[in-house]
Regions:
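Metal-dependent peptidase/peptidase-like ectodomains
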Residues: 143-182
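Non-catalytic positions within long, well-ordered alpha-helices that form the structural scaffold/packing
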Residues: 99-100, 200, 219
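Short acidic/polar active-site loop segments enriched in Thr and Asp
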Residues: 104-105, 205, 224
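Zn-dependent metallopeptidase/amidohydrolase metal-coordination segment
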Residues: 209-247
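Active-site/ligand-binding-proximal alpha/beta "capping" segment
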Residues: 169-205
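Generic non-transmembrane alpha-helical segments
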Residues: 11, 15, 161, 165-176, ...
Length: 272
């Protein structure tokens, strides 16, 4: 794995003149942020050695390097999901490469089903913590000290200072945000009413099929992390409704302007 990480990082360095210190994974609901990146340089995943290729509708599959306001960033447009058949090492490989490139702050986004009765469709949830219910752990197997410690500490998986900054940005722009715990599951089925009840009772506020593996690997490598979910459907007891991928994308698209504004201003505001 170390050789693959090195090979991929060297390929990117050879094709990108100025590697940033900040990266963002553009999940469902944050695709519009690409339109705010200037001086762009794009590399399709299929051209990058050892990179998997995303198969999900709405995830296009390329690395974008450019300027977002006053910050130079790397944006990952299209992520890899465990339910697509990739191993956890493949799902999290891009995060390993980010660390090898010298990136030290990671912003992640996703679409999620809300389980907190206070949530509404279209809400933006700042992730304060997560519950990992994936059947395989991304750090399972041999540990390489070059990548991080055998037993990483996870008491602050999501940066407290970035959470505070994001809340300020939302307040300054009169945007409603909620906070909560994200439950990560493998998918690809949406949750049953009983699963929604269970996930909420064990402490979850929203549930989705991504993010947790990437965050674990980022923290393993010592990166600072900020995460945000757009609530695209509700699994609140008594009002669970049928949901489809198309409906999730539609709800995420409606929330994009608010989510984009928060992320853009937060990235510009924080100190690397």
């Amino acid at each position: 794995m170390l050789e693959k990480i090195k090979e991929t990082a060297e390929y990117i360095k050879a094709h990108v003149s100025n590697i940033p210190k900040t990266a963002i994974i553009l999940g469902t609901g944050l695709v519009e942020l690409v339109n705010h990146i200037t001086d762009k340089q794009e590399i399709p995943y299929q051209e990058i050695p050892n990179f998997p290729i995303s198969t999900v509708e709405g995830h296009s599959g390329k690395l974008i390097f450019g300027q977002l306001g006053n910050k130079r960033i790397m944006a990952m447009q299209g992520r890899f999901h465990f339910y697509e058949g990739y191993s956890m090492q493949q799902v999290t490989f891009p995060v390993r490469v980010m660390k090898a490139l010298g990136i030290n702050t990671l912003f992640v986004s996703n679409a999620a089903g809300g389980m907190n009765p206070e949530f509404k469709i279209g809400d933006i949830m700042i992730i304060t913590d997560h519950i990992n219910l994936f059947p395989e752990h991304p750090l399972r197997g041999k540990n390489y000290e070059e990548l991080g410690p055998r037993f990483p500490e996870m008491s602050e998986a999501y940066s407290h200072r970035l959470i505070a900054d994001a809340k300020k940005v939302a307040e300054e722009n009169n945007i409603r945000v909620v906070e909560g715990v994200y439950v990560g599951t493998q998918g690809p089925t949406f949750e049953t009413p009983a699963e929604y009840r269970y996930f909420h009772r064990i402490g979850g506020d929203a549930v989705g099929m991504s993010t947790v593996p990437e965050v674990i690997v980022a923290r393993h490598g010592g990166m600072e992390v900020f995460g945000v979910s757009v609530i695209t459907d509700l699994g609140v007891e008594g009002i669970v409704e049928k949901v489809s991928h198309e409906e999730v994308q539609k709800a995420a698209a409606l929330a994009q302007p608010k989510m984009t504004l928060i992320m853009k201003e937060l990235i510009n505001k924080f100190k690397e």
